[in-house]
Amino acid sequence: KCLIPLYKSLGPDFIKELDGEFAIVLVDFKNDKLIISTDVFATKPLWYSIGKSVTVASYESAVKSLKHVKPEKLESNTYRVYDLETRELLEEKRVYDFDLRQFRTNFDHWKVAFEKSIKKRAGGLRENIFIGLSSGYDSGGIACQLNKLNIPYKAYTVVGSENKDVLEKRFKLFNENSSGEYI
């Protein structure tokens, strides 16, 4: 419902206004344009082959199965605009332009951004949340933030070479909205 009006309003740059995980194929027959795009991290992969025919799929195997000689994976954070008739690449742009200048002197902004990202991804879900809980920083930070926000989740740990002391301490931090299991 929102993509076509956004495209009509902004043209191919409508992609820059999107937020989230996506792989998009938009065919504009009226203006003979084909637009393909991944999200910033290519969470949703997009494989394609553009030659005599156009093939786009989420899996490389789907493109290969049609005997196209060279399936290509669209890079993360990229959108391309092709002329639908000639198959010529008209433009390639980044979905988001990262500012990598280092000017922060503390972690305050990071903490706010991390909390916001957890709220965004954990809010309004139709399914229950589960996380793979290891003794590493990533899953520990996610579990900590979910607990802080009282967001219900279930954690699973496959015990192997994990630091068991760290895992035991993390399991003690579960609140009434969270629980975990060792596998």
What kind of feature is each model-predicted range?
Residues K1-I183:
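Cysteine-centered catalytic environments shared across enzyme families
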